[in-house]
């Protein structure tokens, strides 16, 4: 089976990242934590990864970007950069939940179907973005829908 060749970026948080999965199965990556400047960083990161792997954008099978949740400006940067690059190279685009991507990397997926992984990310202003995900063998990471009561009682500000 052919190894999928993908470029993925995420600018939805303070972490600005790009990763390239190339034919050799090796992952080439760049990662910088900064409050601002993602738009200035992401394009050079992409160019560096392609040069490092010795390939061109049109050699890839597709592109992916972190669709959040996250800051509005960061989400627009990732979506705009990937859509622009994909259009120019004739590639398909896959939006990926940033929370689901973290859940997928949990050290040891739960073995019981009723258990899951909770992922939280700082949304600033004393709030968090969060998602609860379940793992089923041979299936993608699936979000769990919880009733408001399961999360906790409403609190007065």
Where are these regions (language model features)?
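N-terminal beta-alpha supersecondary unit
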Residues: 1-67
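Surface "functional belts" at beta-alpha junctions
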Residues: 2-4, 92-157
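Short glycine-rich anion-binding loops that position phosphate/pyrophosphate groups of nucleotides
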Residues: 14, 68-69, 123-126
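A glycine- and small-aliphatic-rich helix-loop capping segment at beta-alpha/alpha-beta transitions
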Residues: 23-26, 80-89, 135-138
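Short amphipathic alpha-helical face segments that pack within enzyme cores
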Residues: 41-44, 80, 101
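Short glycine/serine- and small hydrophobic-enriched flexible loop segments
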Residues: 47-48, 87, 107-108
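Phosphate-handling active-site elements
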Residues: 52-58, 86-96, 111-112
